[in-house]
Amino acid sequence: MQFTALVAALLSVAAVQAQRNPITITPQFDCGATNSQQYVARSGDTLTKIAQEIYHDVVGVCDIARANNLADPNRIDAGTPYTIPINCQTYDRNSCL
């Protein structure tokens, strides 16, 4: 009983500390972007199509592949959400191809 009360008290203190000192994590991408969006792939999508037609070439194919740890940038699955780095400082369009 005392152990349970102690654990509950410690968790309560930790929750209060977390509210007072929230941790903000800013994602970092190889292309220098510090922001991202989620894009759910549709049938017929490719990383090239996503980069060029949907994001108007403001991100490279290989930037998307790296952000999602894709071993094969030519293979993406419809219905799968992918992280798209936004506002890249540099664009990698071919090192992974």
UniProtKB/Swiss-Prot annotation:
Family annotation (Gene3D superfamilies): LysM domain (3.10.350.10)
Effects seen without this gene:
Impairs protection against host chitinases and developes significantly more pycnidia.
Q: What is known of its domains?
A: The LysM (lysin motif) domains are small globular domains involved in binding chitin in eukaryotes. Mg1LysM contains one LysM domain.
Q: Name one Pfam family in it.
A: LysM
Q: Which GO terms describe its biological process?
A: effector-mediated suppression of host pattern-triggered immunity
Keyword terms of this UniProt record: Cell wall, Disulfide bond, Secreted, Signal, Virulence
Cited function = Secreted effector that enables the plant pathogenic fungus to manipulate host defenses for successful infection. Binds chitin but not cellulose or xylan. Chitin-induced polymerization of homodimers forms a contiguous Mg1LysM highly oligomeric super-complexe that is anchored to the chitin in the fungal cell wall to prevent hydrolysis by host chitinases.
Cystine pairs annotated here are C31-C88, C62-C96
Show which residues constitute the signal peptide.
1-18
Protein family according to the UniProt entry:
Belongs to the secreted LysM effector family.
Tell me the gene name. Mg1LysM
Q: Which superkingdom?
A: Eukaryota
Q: Could you tell me what induces this protein? A: Expression is up-regulated during wheat leaf infection.
Q: Where in the cell is it found?
A: Secreted; Secreted, Cell wall
GO MF annotation terms: chitin binding; PAMP receptor decoy activity
Subunit composition? Forms homodimers in a chitin-independent manner through interactions at the N-termini of Mg1LysM monomers. Homodimers are further polymerized in a chitin-dependent manner.
Q: What is this protein called?
A: Secreted LysM effector Mg1LysM
Q: Which organism is it from?
A: Zymoseptoria tritici (strain CBS 115943 / IPO323)
What are the LysM domain coordinates in residue numbering?
37-84
UniProt lineage: Eukaryota, Fungi, Dikarya, Ascomycota, Pezizomycotina
The residues the record assigns to binding chitin are G44, T48, N74, I76
